[in-house]
Amino acid sequence: MNKRSIAVIGAAAVALGAQAGLPTGLRFGEHLTIKPYLNVAYTYDSNLDTTHHGESDSIFSVTPGANAEWKGDRWSLSGNAWYRYKHYAKNNSEMGEDSYGQGLTYKYSSSEPDQKGWSLMLGERYQNISASDSINSGDGRGIWRDRERINASAALERRFSSRFHVGAMAQYDWLDYKNGSGYAPLYGWSSWGTQLEAGYAITPWTNFLLAGGYNHYKQKGTSYTKNTSESYTVMAGLGSRATRRIEYRALAGASWLNYGGHNNADSGWTYQLDGNWKVTRTLNVSVRGSSYYQPSERYAGNASKIYALSTGVSYLTLGDHLRLTGDVMFRHEENCYSASRKQADEDTLSFRIGGQYTINRWVSVFTTLSWEREWYQRGTSYDYDRFRGTVGLQFHY
């Protein structure tokens, strides 16, 4: 699931960190913390245009930004904003557009977790991006094309007792490509959806969950059929309760797609997976996954179904100065309806490792290495491998 004006009167106080030498941010009173930063990085990309015979390039970037959090007794408002300047050694005239974005998240709860009461979460994100490091990042294809993306989400939950709860969720997504680069166009789309969920505690640590959802889609650029579609889902599963170290939510069921006025254009199984395990204070393991319909971005008059799964690990060591991370992501996109030229199915697998060492409260050094492989059903001449390596400095407070 995926305006503000904050006025604070008073002097800014710098808080001392819990760990000596770690960045603490700027504290305004007892509730507001702002953490500004500046990233300076170099990236080597072995396959900039993600093709079978890809071209390599070197990318230099400067990214100023800030993270902020404003906390009350039972609520919090967090946000971020960033701007990225990039320079490509070989392809700057085509790829050297700047990127920028921001996001906000509001959370409120009237009671302790798993107790009778209300909880609310609101979120929004905007991004204007000139290039994507991976389709798995969820921000569209976009290679050689600028694009804009907007996400908004809301979740409301009512706990009638410590054992029974009902929730409602809503989300909106909008993706727009700026074509005209001499390459085949990509097609933007928008969608909105709702999901209702009920849960009942069947053990002290486990909830049984039942959910149903509806999504409405609109595709740009199609003249072969109606540009609107809709899908339905019914799922059941389990979720965690009354636990601090292990949190999860796993649902599976069926989904149906009506595309462009064609009823039951596709149907099949679907799933949602979200889990987090705090093994120790310094070691954390997570898993994410989902399947969903969306209009095709490659071909007008086509619909796709996406299956995605990822897992990651984070480890904090050396007095909390060094954070090591690793993740594996898999994405399968299959054509599920064609009113024109059929889109080929494709699979993407990526591995990524990274590390960030905080030298002192002012400077950190970071690096990431990633490898990505993509397979196309239409032939090996479209398959490709991609390696990216980044090293940089982060200046923070």
Residue map of PLM features:
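Cleavable N-terminal export/targeting peptides
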Residues: 1-29
